[in-house]
Amino acid sequence: MFTKKIKMKIIQKLKTYFSFYNNCTIQRFENYMIAKSLQDLKQRSKVWINRVQMDNSNIHMIYVLLDGVGDLPHPDLDGKTPLEAANTPTLDKIASNGTIGEVISVGKGIAPESDIAVFNMLGYKFDHADYAGRGVIEAIGVGIDFKDGDLALRGNYSTLDENEVITDRRAGRQIEKEDADGIAKELEEKIQFSIPDTKIVVAPTIGHRVTVRIRAPTKKLSSRITNTDPAYSNIGGMGVAKAVGDFLKVEKCLPLEDVENAKITSNLVNEFSEQSIKIMKNSDINKKRKEQNKKQLSCILLRDAGNKYPDVPPINEKHEMKFSCIVDMPVELGISEVLKMKAFEAGGLTDYEEKAKVAAKAMETHNAIYVHLKGPDEFGHDGDAIGKMKNIEEIDQRFFKTLVENIDSSNVAIIISADHSTPCINKGHSDDPVPVVVSADYIKNDGTTRMTEEQAKKGSIGLLQGAEVVTKSLELIRSQIKPNH
């Protein structure tokens, strides 16, 4: 064992190498100094030095993901993208006060869903077999009782025509809570499964979104099944958007493995789909909606099955920071719960000023906050390039303007990116790169002046993978922030 006197001598020696040394690292180092031999000391010191070099305790950053903001040139915008066409004076100021690059959130050739994309953008990269599935993440996010062996799926209320062709995969998107809850209750009460005592929870969340949990008490259900939603493939638990046509039907759920529990699970999902279409068709709620000239809630398209709770390290441990978040949607709420992030209340989806003020205030108690703004993605899915441009302008005026008015940019860094692109011309997610900006008074500008897809290609950050963004941003900040800032 080393005496305290020897420890302090070593600390003083090492201190000369690290200008950003602080009391936090002294305590951390003391933990590594319980060495029993010189060899043990060398090994422990290497670990400690790596941690000192990654010390983020003096960094404050606000990390904003603009859902689906990336896009492609569009004829309605004279061949520009919504980011390029938008009037964004505050975003321009932020970009001019930093450096820019581009990001492929999950991987080349993968048009990701938001869940896996956000995990990657927060630094978590999964092998396909290790991912729990969006269904589980959303079940956690909405507070459904879930345990390993249950089956959780993400669902969409959708509209079918008389030939059961999908005419609107979101049933008009805006669905009254009374109608969504009423249909869900009918399904829970009326669906009868072939396996006795199998129970179902149907939980409507926001708009057209639904989370479904199936529990068969005598069976462990499998996540190795296909989606009934024809717009997405299940690739190792990860939802990947497919290129699809206009005449789509609810797909039959199939086992992805020739094993009993996958076959049993797919049968249960098909029983749910087939019975729910009949129940919903005859529902008094849909009769009322027809009289009101509203879109029918004809079926629930299911995707992204999961059967186990995710096993990942907390984000504070991963990045050596005290993280918090502002999120609205069930999937992001689930991610915050899984990663042990404190979630701040900050109004509704479009309460942009409130979100900005809460994010700025969070810098008093946390040194990082992740803010997820949903708006741009929905316009991308609707193919509305002008609407997407206007939404970006609204976010610039209401969120980013309020944010910069409430933070000290000499002390707080702003990182802005997206979870994926949602090109209006495709009406779906794509693997196209999205911009990333790292901005603060102490960050050297690389000559870029706007956060756009084209300028991102010229920025000094280069091309990153999504799982690298937080780490690379922190490296950039540490390399340029003043000691003891």
Report the location of each language-model feature:
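Feature captures the catalytic ectodomains and active-site-proximal regions of enzymes
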Residues: I10, F18, S37-H485
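Nucleic-acid 5′ end/cap handling module spanning
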Residues: I34
